Amino acid sequence: MFCVVLVYNLSMDQQFCQNLKDSRKQAGLTQKQVAKYLNVVESCYANWEQGRTEPNIEMLRKLCFILNVCADDLING
């Protein structure tokens, strides 16, 4: 077993926001559905897609699982 430590300021890269939105749409999910799976309010998730706030590392891990992508795909495209 190995652990990858990811340190990155997501708010500095609008590419993350676009990748998150694209990945969600590719998964066929709405913002409301993703928010429900993450147990956050829809506006919280929408703020991530709009670059107003950023998910913490635990939420990023859950996003990757829900959207079936790796963190590198979300961050770097």
Where are these predicted regions, by residue range?
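Recognition helix of helix-turn-helix/homeodomain-like DNA-binding domains
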Residues: 39-55, 77
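Residues that mark the N-terminal boundary/hinge immediately upstream of a DNA-recognition element
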Residues: 19, 30, 56-59, 70
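Short basic helix-loop element that most often maps to the first helix and adjoining turn
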Residues: 18-37
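Conserved hydrophobic/aromatic packing and binding residues within compact polymer-binding modules
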Residues: 20, 34-35, 45-48, 74
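A detector for short, charged/polar N-terminal pre-domain segments
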Residues: 1-15
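DNA major-groove recognition helix of helix-turn-helix/homeodomain DNA-binding modules
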Residues: 39, 58-73
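Short amphipathic helical patch at the helix-1/turn junction of helix-turn-helix
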Residues: 14, 25-26, 40, 54
